[in-house]
Amino acid sequence: KAKILAERYAAVFGMEAEYLPAFVEDLDTLTTLIHADGWAGEYSRYPTVREQVILIGAVDNDKSRQLCHKAFLKAENLIYIDSGNGEFSGQVVCGVRRNGRTIRKPVGGVFPELLKAQDRFPSELSCAEASLADPQSMAANITAATIVVDMVYNILVNGECSARQTDFSTKTVRMSTTLDKNRSAA
């Protein structure tokens, strides 16, 4: 799935999109993957131009979210979109770091209890444990993925995403979005 999505985004938006067909379970690897490259700018006003990296946390456990949170806090500039859902409900949070400052809280800042969770990485679970760990419905997964795509689309096409967080329930067919408060968006 990751390979196909990366290839589609790269083709449609004429940009570089990377994927890794493996679990990332250490901070050094993740930090290396999200490092923004830079190059000399054409204008004196912008002597150095940096890539804008978007980390999409499509993970199914809090230990992986804790790792993404640590990488977010170490990053100079990063957009971190995290989607999480259970069987019928979930949320998508867009965190932003700019020039070493947190402009918008990431998922760990919005839901600090997940930073204390004691679960395991997917590679540490047996097949039986993994299948029982967190029941999810196809509708909740599709809803979370659609919100992530909308956020990324707005960043790539419109240059910003004004949505900080979207909570949803597929059982009650409800969606609620918290917008930026007249500050620069992602």
Feature names for model-found ranges:
Residues 1-17:
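Glycine-rich phosphate-binding loop and adjoining beta1-alpha1-beta2 segment
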Residues 7, 11, 32, 66, ...:
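Charged/polar, solvent-exposed surface patches and flexible loops
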Residues 16-22, 161-164:
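A short coil-to-beta-strand element that immediately follows conserved catalytic motifs
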Residues 20-30, 38:
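Conserved SAM/SAH-binding loop
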Residues 28-33, 175-179:
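Short, solvent-exposed polar/charged micro-motifs at secondary-structure junctions
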Residues 34-42:
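Conserved amphipathic alpha-helix within the SDR
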Residues 41, 46-54, 59-186:
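Glycine-rich phosphate/adenylate-binding loop
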